[in-house]
Curated annotation (Swiss-Prot):
Pfam families: IspA. It is a multi-pass membrane protein. GO terms for cellular component: plasma membrane. This is Inner membrane-spanning protein YciB. It comes from Neisseria meningitidis serogroup B (strain ATCC BAA-335 / MC58). Signal peptide: none annotated. The keyword Membrane applies. The chain crosses the membrane at residues 23-43, 50-70, 74-94, 119-139, 150-170. The gene is yciB. The lineage of its organism: Bacteria, Pseudomonadati, Pseudomonadota, Betaproteobacteria, Neisseriales.
Amino acid sequence: MKFVSDLLSVILFFATYTVTKNMIAATAVALVAGVVQAAFLYWKYKKLDTMQWVGLVLIVVFGGATIVLGDSRFIMWKPSVLFWLGALFLWGSHLAGKNGLKASIGREIQLPDAVWAKLTYMWVGFLIFMGIANWFVFTRFESQWVNYKMFGSTALMLVFFIIQGIYLSTCLKKED
C-alpha cells in the first residue's frame, strides 16, 4: 500500500500527461496530489519522514517553477535532484561514520557493517547513475521523458533491486 501511495502523484502525472499532452497541466496535478498526500500523511501519522519532506519541497519548488514560468524543464530536473540528494545523503552519512541505509532499514534486516557499507556504495552509485540517466533523457529526448520517467526509471529500479537481492542472498548464505 505504501508503494502505491508513494507513486500516486507520479501515476496521476503520467495519466494527465497521457490524456492532455500538456506538461504544465500534468505538473499541476502532480503538485496538488503531492501536497494533498503529504497533508493526509501528516494528519494521519502526525509526522512526515525525511524523504517525504524532501519530496514535498522538491515538487513544490520544481513543480511551482514549471507552472509559474511555463517551462517543463524544471519538473524534468526534479528526479535528478532527488536522486543526487539521496546519493549525497548516503555518502555524507558514510563519511561521517554513520550508515544512512542501515539507519533507514536496519530494523528489517540484520547485516554485518561491511555489507551495509557495500550496499551504501551500490546505492550511491545507482542514485548518481539514475540522476545522470534522467538528465540525459530529458535533455536529448524531451518528448519521451514522461514515458522514461514512468517505465524506464521504474524498470531500472526493479533491475537494481533484483541485483541487490542477489547480492544480499549471497551475503546471508555466507553468514549461515
